[in-house]
C-alpha cells in the first residue's frame, strides 16, 4: 500500500474540478481472491474517494500504470528515508510541504513496509530498513533546467525536516543527492554491517571497481 501527496493530473478518470489541485492518492495491490480483495478495500472505499480505479487487472498492467507520468527528458531529484510509524509530526511535514510543491509533477510517497519485506533478516540481502514500518520517497520532477535550484532546495528542505523523525538508512534508489561525501552517504544508506559485507563481496567479484556508474560501494581494502 502506498499513499501519495500529488497534484491531480489531467487524466480522463480525474474529475475536471480537481485537476491541478493537491490531493492525497492511495495505490495498492491485492494478490489473492477477488472477494477478499474487495473486503480489504472496503475501509478505503467507505471514505468516498473522489476517484476510485481499483479493479482486477493483470500484473503487467499494474506495473505500467504510472509509466505515463515519467516520460524521457524530465529533470528529477529524489531523497528518501525510513520511519517507524506515521507520527503527527511526519504527517504535518508531508502535508505542509505537499501543499507547496513547486511543480505539478512532484510527489511525496509513503510506502507501507512489513509483511514479506520484514521477514528477511537485516543482513540477509543488500537492502536496509527491513524493520521499518514505512519508507518515504520525496520525488521532485520538473522540465526547465533553469529551475533546478528551486526544486532541489525544496526537496532538501523537506528531507531536513523529516531527518529527525527517520530511522537509520535509506532506500538507495532514492539517493540522488550529490553534495558532500557520496561514499559516506551510500554507507549510511546501507548501514555499517551490511556495507562492510557488500564491500568484501565487491573486493572478491569486482576488485577493479568496473561496475561503478552507480551509488558505488568501493571494494574493501
What do these predicted ranges mean?
Residues 1-221:
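Soluble FAD-dependent oxygen oxidases
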Amino acid at each position: 500500500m502506498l499513499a501519495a501527496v500529488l497534484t491531480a493530473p489531467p487524466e480522463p478518470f480525474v474529475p475536471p474540478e480537481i485537476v491541478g489541485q493537491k490531493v492525497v492518492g492511495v495505490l495498492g495491490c491485492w494478490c489473492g481472491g477477488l472477494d477478499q480483495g474487495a473486503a480489504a478495500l472496503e475501509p478505503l472505499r467507505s471514505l468516498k474517494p473522489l476517484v476510485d480505479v481499483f479493479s482486477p487487472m493483470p500484473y503487467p498492467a499494474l506495473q505500467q500504470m504510472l509509466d505515463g507520468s515519467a516520460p524521457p527528458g524530465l529533470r528529477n531529484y529524489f531523497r528518501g528515508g525510513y520511519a517507524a510509524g506515521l507520527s503527527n509530526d511526519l504527517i504535518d511535514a508531508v502535508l505542509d510541504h505537499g501543499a507547496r510543491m513547486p511543480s505539478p509533477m512532484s510527489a511525496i510517497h509513503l510506502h507501507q513496509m512489513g509483511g514479506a519485506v520484514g521477514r528477511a533478516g537485516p543482513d540477509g540481502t543488500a537492502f536496509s530498513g527491513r524493520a521499518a514500518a514505512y519508507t518515504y520517497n520525496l520525488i521532485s520532477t520538473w522540465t526547465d533546467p533553469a529551475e533546478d535550484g528551486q526544486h532541489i532546495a525544496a526537496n532538501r528542505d523537506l528531507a531536513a525536516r523529516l531527518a529527525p523523525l527517520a530511522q537509520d538508512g535509506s532506500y538507495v534508489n532514492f539517493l540522488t543527492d550529490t553534495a558532500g561525501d557520496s561514499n559516506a552517504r551510500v554507507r549510511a544508506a546501507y548501514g555499517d554491517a551490511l556495507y562492510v559485507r557488500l564491500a568484501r563481496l565487491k573486493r572478491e567479484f569486482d576488485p577493479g571497481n568496473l561496475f561503478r556508474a552507480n551509488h558505488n560501494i568501493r571494494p574493501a581494502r
